[in-house]
């Protein structure tokens, strides 16, 4: 209701102007976790390497190398004109969840899929194996 807007704004300002003291202490402690952060960085680097080699081996040859996040975008216009249906087909046939490009681009998204490598390295290797098997069967079928 309009008469509550200013009251809610005042309450919300307390969350945005300055984070609570406990959150500030936790953030400082997180900056001291150098070994853990480096271990995570190494996992992401290995997962990225696996994706950049494994996706083309599976048939996804038009990929945009990730630069700042743990996602690989693949142009699948040579494989489909419906990324939503293709993502569902991959989930059903390979048991691998990918995201249709329409979630990010309403104009050209039907031609793109997004692959995440924010999982364990074993999960990434298994997912790529499943994608290879699925795509080989799809090409033969």
Kindly give the residue locations of the regions a language model identified.
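PLP-dependent class I/II
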Residues: 1-141
């Amino acid at each position: 209701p309009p008469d509550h807007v200013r009251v809610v704004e005042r309450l919300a300002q307390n969350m945005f102007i300055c984070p609570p003291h406990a959150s500030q202490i936790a953030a400082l402690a997180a900056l001291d976790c150098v070994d853990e952060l480096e271990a995570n960085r190494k996992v992401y680097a290995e997962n990225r390497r696996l994706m950049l080699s494994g996706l083309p081996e599976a048939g996804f040859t038009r990929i945009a190398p990730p630069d700042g996040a743990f996602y690989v975008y693949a142009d699948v216009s040579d494989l489909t004109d419906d990324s939503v249906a293709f993502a569902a087909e991959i989930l059903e046939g390979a048991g691998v969840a990918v995201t249709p490009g329409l979630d990010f681009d309403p104009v050209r998204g039907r031609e793109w899929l997004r692959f995440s490598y924010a999982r364990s390295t074993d999960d990434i290797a298994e997912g790529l194996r499943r994608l290879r098997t699925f795509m080989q069967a799809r090409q033969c079928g």
